[in-house]
């Protein structure tokens, strides 16, 4: 009886593990598809004449709140002034 319970538990655990792994694999494939789509959009932007490095910077900055951006800018200005770059 105890062996049946242990075997059932192992079967359930194996099934859960398999399901989790398959979900991760599907998500990884979706992530790859999305990354390819993003790459295509950047290629389109470059083909239109936009600077993709600037676009990437803008996207990175838009993810931050205003206070965080201002703090980052202040530190950058301070460092540039210390190096005589401004």
From Swiss-Prot:
It holds the Pfam family GapR_DNA-bd. Signal peptide: none annotated. One of its GO terms (molecular function) is DNA binding. Belongs to the UPF0335 family. NCBIfam families: PRK13694.1. This is UPF0335 protein mll3968.
